[in-house]
Amino acid sequence: CSVSAPERTADRNFASEDPEPLYKEDTWYADFTSNNTIYEKFPFSLWRKTMREVLSEYDLELVQRAHFLGVPALRKAIADYLYRSRGMNVSPECIVIGASIEYLYEKLIKLLPENSVYGAENPGYRKIPRIYEEFGLPWKSIEMDESGVSMASLRESSANIVHVSPEHHYPLGTVTTAGRRQELLSWAAEAADRYIIEDDYDCEFRYSTKSIPALQSMDLNHRVIYMNTFSKSLAPAIRISYMVLPRKLMEHYIARANFYSNSASSCEQYALARFIENGSFERHLSRLKKYYRQEGERLLRIIKQSSLIPSSRIT
């Protein structure tokens, strides 16, 4: 059927109107979100140099579909870095690269035992329970104490998978003690369907004490799944995260997920591999740690000089 000219004109006029946005960004006077970085401290000149090197040395690799586990050069660079920085002796073959922790979590959930109950730290990073809720997974809150995740709370729950952040808990800042880490590993070894998801986010930024080796490095029973991201150590816009799977889970992943395309940019993966290999990444971390330490000390001085906040327990 035909449409009359007046109706067409009305349709065009309607289409030309600006629709209301479906989502509006909030505007804040001060931003205290915990996952931000100091964008001005991003190593722009070094990153540009690295990108130019990658663009000049690689051709088809940058535009072809990447390996579904991630670019091999980056997986090897990450494995070497984890050995130096976290005491982890892992094979690049057990590392999976993805564009975000959320993406990797989606893949991980499909590998874990069916009918699993997930445990999340309370208080803790709210995004983790939201992921469980998004997939309709049962989860329990696991209380914290001064040593880390409460073993009593964990045992009282029906959880067989627990998500922990032993190196730097958010928001309490607790560092899980070596003894509690051993207790967690013993708990995981007691049943075949138990796993620990170690979220090592922010592990690079320890100022007053020496880092404890990663929980994964202490695991003799292959029950720890290690996850981390470069969003805090570099920038949120560099969408590269990774997980280290126990070999048994990795075999399942290869068998079941090899048809997936890798979600991270190949060009950025090659650039990050080079950035880690030539030492630029660790030098950048050293500069960031110095800056954050100084800023933290300055903030504490200001708080202690102020009468607005009791300072007797601030450290």
Mark where each language-model region is.
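Conserved acidic functional residues
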Residues: 1, 198-202
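Conserved core segment of the aminotransferase class I/II
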Residues: 47, 220-290
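Conserved core of the PLP fold type I
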Residues: 51-54, 61-192, 203-204, 210-218, ...
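Short Gly/Ser/Thr- and Asp/Glu-enriched loop/turn motifs at secondary-structure junctions
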Residues: 91-92, 313-315
